[in-house]
Amino acid sequence: MARRCEVTGRGTVSGNNVSHSHIKTRRTWKVNLIKKRIFLEDENRWVTIRLSTRALRTLRKKGIKAAIKDNGGSLGVLAPKKYAGITKQALKKA
């Protein structure tokens, strides 16, 4: 799974560290991601999504569906997952 926010689409970016003597070295900046359970009142169920802490602030302000639409995302993030709640061991046995 890529390190990408499911609400805003933000991911890892790369650039340079620049020292005092202007020597440039490559580095990456990773998104501060968390897993968050959100209750969908109109569907009466919980959804677990992976989002950045910045997106979490937006969710508290606007609500989940408005935040996804404003960022050009798909509401498919909220769709029930095919194997939600099933462990890897149970999938191997099946």
From Swiss-Prot:
Chain positions covered by the region annotation Disordered: 1-21
Keywords from the named record: Ribonucleoprotein, Ribosomal protein
Keyword Cytoplasm: no
Comp. bias regions, Polar residues: 11-20
GO BP terms, alphabetized: translation
GO cellular component terms given for this protein: ribonucleoprotein complex; ribosome
GO molecular function, one term: structural constituent of ribosome
A Pfam family matched in the record: Ribosomal_L28
Family: Belongs to the bacterial ribosomal protein bL28 family.
PANTHER family per record: 39S RIBOSOMAL PROTEIN L28, MITOCHONDRIAL, LARGE RIBOSOMAL SUBUNIT PROTEIN BL28M
The protein, known as: Large ribosomal subunit protein bL28
Source lineage: Bacteria, Pseudomonadati, Spirochaetota, Spirochaetia, Leptospirales
